[in-house]
Curated annotation (Swiss-Prot):
Expression sites by tissue: Ubiquitously expressed in all tissues, with strong expression detected in senescent leaves.
Function comment: Exhibits pyrophosphatase activity with stronger affinity for pyrophosphate (PPi), moderate affinity for ATP and ADP, and weak affinity for tripolyphosphate (PPPi). No activity observed toward uridine substrate. Positively regulates natural and dark-induced leaf senescence.
Name listed for the protein in its UniProt record: Inorganic pyrophosphatase TTM1
Segment annotated as transit peptide: 1-15
Organism listed in the record: Arabidopsis thaliana (Mouse-ear cress)
Lineage: Eukaryota, Viridiplantae, Streptophyta, Embryophyta, Tracheophyta
PANTHER family assigned: URIDINE KINASE
Changes seen on gene knockout: Delayed dark-induced and natural senescence.
Amino acid sequence: MALDSSVALSPRRRHGLLRDQVQLIKRKDSGRYEIVPIEDPLSFEKGFYAVIRACQLLAQKNDGLILVGLAGPSGAGKTIFTEKILNFMPSIAIINMDNYNDGTRVIDGNFDDPRLTDYDTLLDNIHGLRDGKPVQVPIYDFKSSSRIGYRTLEVPSSRIVILEGIYALSEKLRPLLDLRVSVTGGVHFDLVKRVLRDIQRAGQEPEEIIHQISETVYPMYKAFIEPDLKTAQIKILNKFNPFSGFQNPTYILKSSKAVTPEQMKAALSEDFKERTEETYDIYLLPPGEDPEACQSYLRMRNRDGKYNLMFEEWVTDRPFIISPRITFEVSVRLLGGLMALGYTIATILKRKSHIFDDDKVIVKTDWLEQLNRTYVQVQGKDRTFVKNVADQLGLEGSYVPHTYIEQIQLERLVNDVLALPDDLKTKLSLDDDTVSSPKEALSRASVDSRMKYLHGGVSKSYTNPRHKVLPNLTRLAVNNRMLDARAPASPATLPNQGFITQLSDQISTLNERMDEFTSRIEELNSKIPNRIAPSGSQHNLALPIENGNGSVLSFSASASQLVRESPLMEEVVLVARGQRQIMHQMDTLSNLLREYVGEKTRIERLDSSRTNSTTQNLESSTVPILLGLAIGCVGIFAYSRLK
């Protein structure tokens, strides 16, 4: 095939300019011209320009019909590309090869088999258009998988017809084509676009489509489509995806400011609807992505026992979060299939939402259990309306322009959300200690055990105050004895000594219950490894989780993350929280006792005779009642937690 220099657009080809790369060449087998192949793949926009330029040149040099073949794998963007050309050149005609499918030839549900195409009718239509005659193009119904009629197509005024389909560059059609164009894209986005297209066009269930992709689409692509695409003169690598177009995005304003339900209701129309939801969002990391920088998570949401797969990407236009989202219901079995394809679980977030919706905008509060934070969100399709509602709520100046998964990435909380808390992993043990009295030994041992527990799993800001307070509790009885030895004996101090002794006995009893408490946690903690089967790989580790409808969810993931969702771990977390609350009560009780004893001693030293009656009345009424109530509350709380 020789280059005809007499028709070349430029005697000096300048490869730096795209318009100069689109060159004509004359065919050896006919007097028609075609495009010199462009070696490097072009982007979506550059490919669009190159195709428009090529069509204009071909229309200038060739007589009759200009037939353009546009091929590519399912969901790669062929239809979007042809529609873009049609908007720019309304006088062209488009023939979609999907309309030439013959439903009677379908074998095992494989709609991408090349034998499914009715080439006889297609070739008759092409030859009819070349002869300048109107033709009857079939109409194919994807829901019924059958041909339901015909439409009349006449030769367009521009004489340009685009033949679009996965086999538009097949060997049977190539001799008739004046221009060959291929469109391909990434596997991840091809999957998304295929699901999106088929849901809208065929009404198929998403699970069926994904199974269809894995079983038929890619094998057919490798065997029949990919070899034809190599013959294209213009190759387009489509990085365009359903999200980057933002045809129907959701605008979100998020704030950490506290807003009451009454304020939310006042900002909405009168016909708003109110509801509450509890959701579990499982964020799936695509293969090869960095968990700290990924912006294209797949999110599987569990709500009311139903699972939805959500494709979304986020763009921040401060203070807005723009989220083009695609959601469809799937079976829980899909999670295992995606993980088998290389997806991994990045994190699982539990969210409780209080939602107010008036069809124009959604206002809701989200409480995230793992982050222990509450946020208010205003969401809607109208950017201006969302901003107005947020202003009515007084959110200006308090916006958080980050999604929840971005906040985890930015605050480096991934490990905190994925792994079990360190304090639940710490083994609770009791060290022997030699002290002067059995009561002090029991109390000191319990305190030492708890101090080791706290140092192993709680921050220094929490443990340091306890280090100063708890020893005062353990030495309370000893200090009282030393104080009484220096003070003169009186009728008031004798009942006081008996009261302190009784109080010490009660505290010792409480410490014994605390020991039982810590033993219970240790027992529960020891059960954790028994619930998890050891495995050398994350992907082979399975944990059964029951959802609301009784079905069993089994999927591969990090052991520490999945155990967190188990009933055993919920019990351990509740027990640990109860223990911390009891320890705070013990701190408060210790401080009260120290203040009371110090005040009593000071008063006795100043005026022993004058304060005897007052101290006796105080001890006989107010103090025993207050301290008795405090100890009783702590004891009841501890006993209920043990139960």
